[in-house]
């Protein structure tokens, strides 16, 4: 089928600080500091992700959908919960 996205996407490493994924020839780091909802996830849950389109990733076991740009530039996407912080 024309237009299908078929590049390789895989989990390459997990540490206590975050994890790395390979999208085609680009490796991206997702630090738990910026993506805290992955911190309690199992390796199985983190590694079971889909790359349905060039700009989107989806973790069905966790029901997490992320823009690839939010991983490349987390400072542009304030995703970290501010619960408990005082102004």
Regions found by a protein language model. Give the residues of each.
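Motif-centric detector for short Cys/His coordination patterns
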Residues: 1-87
């Amino acid at each position: 089928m024309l237009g299908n996205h078929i590049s390789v996407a895989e989990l390459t490493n997990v540490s206590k600080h975050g994890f790395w994924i390979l999208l085609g020839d680009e490796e991206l780091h997702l630090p738990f500091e910026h993506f805290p909802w992955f911190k309690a996830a199992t390796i199985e849950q983190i590694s079971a992700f889909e790359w349905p389109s060039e700009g989107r990733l989806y973790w069905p076991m966790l029901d997490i959908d992320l823009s690839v740009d939010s991983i490349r530039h987390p400072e542009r996407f304030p995703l970290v919960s501010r619960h408990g912080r005082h102004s």
